[in-house]
């Protein structure tokens, strides 16, 4: 996902002066893997408007929209959606659990809870957010979020919306995921993944991965990180706490996202909106090149892909993706 959802030209100009240009994105060079994005046909298109970004999947799929200070709930059986106002500038991921959609808001340092069934705001409570480009998680009876750049992982009780534990992980940690019986946190600054015990809140392992890991997902037999330093993906074996594969995806630089599900691992980045990795071989088997992309989620029989710059969200049948050549 992109660093900020603010789209005013003056702000973008200031960002261009403050940050170096994105490194070239070569993609993969394996013959037969690269496919023009225009060949990929979505099963449904949701015209969200604004800048649809972070997503979460429950019975329906949710997407945040920072410029509009809202989230949208998309019906997976049609192209309809409803919008829900939340806090200022929703950012840094979405998570669905305990009857709620959990929405971090960078503009006012709050968390908004939205009812998954009725789409109504249940609560809004103050909590700092480490970075606008990160990720949150639900699992082990809690909501998890990084709250500062020093590496503070907060565990929130969904019954009280109160922080009940703070776990100290490496600095520059911004994204967290839950799965395989543990909490997993990427440190972009230290290029490691921290494994946290869900019962004791203690750090169990620190696992070196590729350079500058940011986004993380659990599924398809592994823990996977998208490494912004060189555009690679690291696969961690949760049984050994070691990297079992490093996959060159060719998408270095900021933004992007990764999701495991529907038999594949999916990566999105500007210029290469969708890349599919086969977890049985740890190889990139398809890479779609062209415009679009920014956030990806897989689940309940679909792959969901945001097109940040055009305000669209695509719903895709993974079988249709695999058949596209």
Region locations from a protein language model:
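Predominantly soluble domains enriched in secretory-pathway, periplasmic, or organellar proteins
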Residues: 15-325
């Amino acid at each position: 996902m992109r660093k900020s959802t603010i789209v005013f030209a003056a702000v973008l100009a200031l960002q261009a002066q403050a940050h170096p240009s994105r490194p070239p994105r070569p993609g993969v060079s394996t013959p037969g893997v690269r496919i023009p994005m225009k060949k990929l046909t979505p099963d449904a298109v949701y015209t969200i408007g604004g800048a649809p970004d972070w997503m979460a999947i429950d019975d329906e799929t949710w997407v945040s929209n920072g410029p509009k200070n809202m989230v949208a709930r998309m019906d997976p059986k049609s192209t309809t959606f409803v919008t829900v106002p939340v806090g200022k500038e929703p950012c840094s991921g979405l998570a669905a659990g305990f009857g709620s959609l959990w929405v971090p808001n960078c503009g006012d340092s709050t968390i908004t809870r939205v009812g998954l069934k009725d789409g109504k705001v249940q609560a809004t409570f103050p909590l700092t957010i480490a970075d606008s480009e990160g990720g949150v998680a639900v699992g082990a009876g809690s909501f998890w979020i990084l709250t500062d750049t020093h590496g503070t992982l907060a565990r929130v009780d969904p019954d009280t919306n109160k922080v009940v534990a703070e776990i100290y992980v490496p600095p520059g940690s911004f994204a967290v995921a839950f799965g395989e019986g543990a909490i997993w946190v990427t440190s972009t600054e230290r290029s490691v993944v921290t494994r946290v015990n869900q019962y004791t809140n203690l750090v169990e392992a620190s696992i070196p991965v590729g350079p500058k890991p940011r986004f993380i997902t659990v599924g398809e037999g592994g823990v996977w990180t998208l490494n912004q330093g060189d555009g690679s993906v690291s696969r961690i074996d949760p049984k050994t706490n070691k990297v079992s594969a490093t996959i060159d995806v060719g998408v270095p630089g900021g933004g992007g996202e990764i999701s495991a599900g529907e038999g594949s691992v999916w990566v999105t980045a500007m210029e290469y909106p969708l890349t599919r990795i086969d977890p049985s071989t740890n190889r990139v088997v398809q890479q779609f090149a062209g415009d679009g992309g920014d956030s990806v989620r897989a689940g309940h029989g679909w792959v969901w892909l945001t097109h940040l710059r055009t305000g669209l969200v695509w719903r895709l049948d993974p079988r249709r993706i695999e058949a596209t050549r």
